[in-house]
């Protein structure tokens, strides 16, 4: 004997709802928060993340400013505004090669890293020079105090 149609639909809704609810709960309780994810990183990666946070926020702010300007304009959506499109070409057919904001940020970040590395190397070199000068002066003072003609 067949069950009524409404019971079949009720089973479908119950099973479907339980699958969806189970998936949502599983996702909610198994996905780590941003803080937990950052805390689980190695110390080197966590330090790099903290250093680059300001840069990422600045990039996001600039991108949002560009998006808002583009949204206010009456131009078609495929015109990218200040961000250079890789598909836009000049009249002569050559690809436009302009440096956009994000390339400048990357270049600035690389220059800062290079300056930091040079500063670290200079400090290390200065400390090595100081150690070398100290050892040299110790050796010279030791030899001055021990003349070859003195017995004691």
UniProtKB/Swiss-Prot annotation:
GO terms for biological process: mitochondrial respiratory chain complex III assembly. Residues 105-139 form a coiled coil. One of its GO terms (cellular component) is mitochondrial inner membrane. It holds the Pfam family CBP4. Keywords: Chaperone, Coiled coil, Membrane, Mitochondrion, Mitochondrion inner membrane, Transmembrane, Transmembrane helix. It is a single-pass membrane protein. The keyword Transmembrane helix applies. It is found in: Mitochondrion inner membrane. Its main location: mitochondrion. The chain crosses the membrane at residues 5-27. The keyword RNA-binding does not apply. One of its GO terms (molecular function) is actin binding. Belongs to the CBP4 family. Essential for the assembly of ubiquinol-cytochrome c reductase. It has a direct effect on the correct occurrence of the Rieske protein, core 4, core 5 and apocytochrome b. This is Assembly factor CBP4. The lineage of its organism: Eukaryota, Fungi, Dikarya, Ascomycota, Saccharomycotina. The gene is CBP4.
